[in-house]
UniProtKB/Swiss-Prot annotation:
Transmembrane segments: 79-99
GO CC list: external side of plasma membrane; plasma membrane
Gene Ontology terms for molecular function: signaling receptor activity
Protein name: Tumor necrosis factor receptor superfamily member 13C
Disease: Immunodeficiency, common variable, 4: A primary immunodeficiency characterized by antibody deficiency, hypogammaglobulinemia, recurrent bacterial infections and an inability to mount an antibody response to antigen. The defect results from a failure of B-cell differentiation and impaired secretion of immunoglobulins; the numbers of circulating B-cells is usually in the normal range, but can be low.
Consequence of changing C24Y: Abolishes a disulfide bond and thereby changes the specificity, so that both TNFSF13B and TNFSF13 can be bound
Record membrane topology: Single-pass type III membrane protein
Name of the gene: TNFRSF13C
Polar residues bias spans: 168-184
Ranges per topology, Extracellular: 1-78
TNFR-Cys repeats by residue range: 18-35
Keyword Transmembrane helix: yes
Essential for TNFSF13B/TALL1/BAFF/BLyS binding: annotated span: 26-31
Cystine pairs: C19-C32, C24-C35
Length: 184
């Protein structure tokens, strides 16, 4: 059961139709469409260079000498747009760095000019960072920690952590509710 050679058109393709000079044949929809919808140059009028009108079997209208000019925007978008975006980001980063550096320089200059405005080293120190203790007697004999009443190793903790009851089965629900003082 051998089949003959397959057609390039496919089984359900319509018969080749000639297109008018203002239209180009589109292989995707297999019909004549306006050439402006395709990225092809306008078809040349039939003259000495074209022996017959173009048909569906002659898709040279969609690929030809003008295909290079139509494909130019694609590499420009693929390489040009990311390059411009990268340059814009680098420029923004440089500007942010310059602004922060200038602010830091101003702050350092302002601090140095505030320390010695007249060059007088005997000037009183500003009281911005001086801590003033309240008057009173400090109790130097008070212990830092109260003495332990009981040994913490032998006393049970005041709270309990719920653990799963494995002897009842693995499907038992364990809640985090703790026992209050009335239940102990």
């Amino acid at each position: 059961m051998r089949r003959g050679p397959r057609s390039l058109r496919g089984r359900d393709a319509p018969a080749p139709t000639p297109c008018v000079p203002a239209e180009c044949f589109d292989l995707l929809v297999r019909h004549c469409v306006a050439c402006g919808l395709l990225r092809t140059p306008r078809p040349k009028p039939a003259g000495a260079s074209s022996p017959a009108p173009r048909t569906a079997l002659q898709p040279q209208e969609s690929v030809g000498a003008g295909a290079g000019e139509a494909a130019l925007p694609l590499p420009g978008l693929l390489f040009g747009a990311p390059a411009l975006l990268g340059l814009a980001l680098v420029l923004a980063l440089v500007l942010v760095g310059l602004v922060s550096w200038r602010r830091r320089q101003r702050r350092l200059r302002g601090a140095s000019s505030a320390e010695a405005p007249d060059g007088d080293k005997d000037a009183p120190e500003p009281l911005d960072k001086v801590i003033i203790l309240s008057p009173g007697i400090s109790d130097a004999t008070a212990p830092a920690w109260p003495p332990p009443g009981e040994d913490p190793g032998t006393t049970p903790p005041g709270h309990s952590v719920p653990v799963p009851a494995t002897e009842l089965g693995s499907t038992e629900l364990v809640t985090t509710k703790t026992a209050g003082p009335e239940q102990q």
